[in-house]
């Protein structure tokens, strides 16, 4: 089958197309530096069969219209279509999303509830943690739940929670 596909593909390359088309444009040439890189790449494929190298050279010499015609012919011949192949970039993006779980680095300390017996002790702790004046600390405690600290490190949030729970307040870290 490989030889049949090879001979069919090669015969298409050598036959002119039946549809009228504009005259083929002259083939583009590579600058000397690019030719050297290409020559090095071709030299590394010297272990491949001569058929493969000959076919590769023939395909590389095609114009864009001839290449499009070759692709159409091979899709018909092999019963495949470009739509049957999923885009490669979509799979890479999905993998990248799964690999990088976002780790939270900033936390908010929220005072949920303060029993009436622990209000004075809680106000003292709030003043020590935030450097608020007495009136602002009292106002903070009255309209709960409220954020005591925003965007702090995990250690600082845990320490504040520990101190506030020590005097009887209910605290959460978000």
From Swiss-Prot:
Keywords: Chloroplast, Plastid, Ribonucleoprotein, Ribosomal protein, Transit peptide. Residues 7-18 have a biased composition (Low complexity). Its main location: plastid. GO terms for biological process: translation. It is found in: Plastid, Chloroplast. Pfam families: Ribosomal_L12, Ribosomal_L12_N. Residues 1-46 are annotated as: Disordered. InterPro entries: Ribosomal_bL12, Ribosomal_bL12_C, Ribosomal_bL12_C/ClpS-like, Ribosomal_bL12_oligo, Ribosomal_bL12_oligo_N_sf. Residues 19-29 have a biased composition (Pro residues). Gene3D superfamilies: 3.30.1390.10, Single helix bin. The keyword Transit peptide applies. It comes from the Eukaryota. One of its GO terms (molecular function) is mRNA binding. One of its GO terms (cellular component) is ribonucleoprotein complex. Residues 1-45 form a transit peptide. Belongs to the bacterial ribosomal protein bL12 family. PANTHER family: 39S RIBOSOMAL PROTEIN L12, LARGE RIBOSOMAL SUBUNIT PROTEIN BL12C. This is Large ribosomal subunit protein bL12cz.
